[in-house]
Amino acid sequence: SFATWSESESRGGFNEEELDATEIGVKYKSSDNRLVVNAAYYEYDYTDQQQQIIVVTQSGSLAGKTFNAGESEMTGFELETKYAITDNTQIDFNYYSSDTSFKSFVIPTARPPLNFTGNQMNYSPESAYNIAFTTVSDDDSSILRVAYSYKDEYFMDPSNRYISMQDSYGVANVSYTKYFTDDWKMKIFCTNCTDEIYKTQVTTFAIPYGGGGRNYYANARRIGVEITKTF
């Protein structure tokens, strides 16, 4: 088991961001080294957390600026496991849960003034997990990997406006790598195999400028073959 506490600062041309971090957890490894389990509970308390937001200034212009959220916090749980089914095959499973909130976040200099107090922190799904299956041939000449990851819905902007929300989604990836020699290999792959449509970033515009935003999406399904020669 373990317990840690740390304090850190992030500097810039604005108030320093301060973080008090506390973690309590356990680590386990079986006697045959086939099973590894790490679990931890954490609490992160931020003071003046730095956030980049596009706002309308008092002069009426649109500007992207860095602001300090007065108080914000994140609590959660992490679980990481590895299990070797055989000498050649392993399963990895990771799970994360978090509860986040801006305890105090007001921008009085924006027009109109903005109040994000009580909102969920951006890019913070309540739960997420990923699982992967990896098997290696007896002679180490080929590797098959199948992976799936999932995230609950979350917001990409501290305003928590609907346009910045990403619905829950899952992504599957598959790859097979064959080593012919020390310097030649071939990889057959499929990324985002179910062709999931999901956002990777959202730029939101201030309400006096229409209140809309610009969405950036992940790559669609890709299937291909890579042949690599190293020198």
Tell me what each language-model feature is.
Residues 1, 32-37, 88-91, 139-144, ...:
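Repeated loop/turn-to-beta-strand initiation elements of outer-membrane beta-barrel proteins
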Residues 19-23, 72-80, 124-130, 169-173, ...:
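Transmembrane beta-barrel architecture of outer-membrane proteins
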Residues 45, 67-159, 194, 228:
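Gram-negative outer-membrane beta-barrel transporters
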